[in-house]
Amino acid sequence: MDWDEYEEKGLVRKAFVDREHIKSLMKMSQAKLDFAAKQAIDESSSSIILVLYYDALREVCEALAILNGFKVYSHEAFVHFLKYKLSEDEASRIFNRYRRLRNGVNYYGKPVSAGEAAKARSEVPELITHLKEKYLKEFN
């Protein structure tokens, strides 16, 4: 499905730029990053920690969508938003990877390894920093 199809199906809609909502999303994203960074990663915590990192990234993507005048109702649509609206191919790839891992945890009870959570701990904050510095400086 491409971006236009998401719009046609109502999974993405035009929205007004709500600056307070963007600020709130950025604050929640940072809180999740801060909390996740303090947690020890082991086999029993790794899935929970990965989901926290994914949620922090998704909230930044939601803030970006709102800033660009969109309300997104599908996590998968963020993959296309990053790639086709922002031309962020690598960000799109990384987001999609963590989206799939998170879906495995949340919908299928599939655990992720401590190594995957450790990778998220280094990769996700780096990507969030890139997106914030490039697009969301005024909301930091």
Which residue stretches match the model-derived regions?
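Terminal alpha-helical segments
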Residues: 1-140
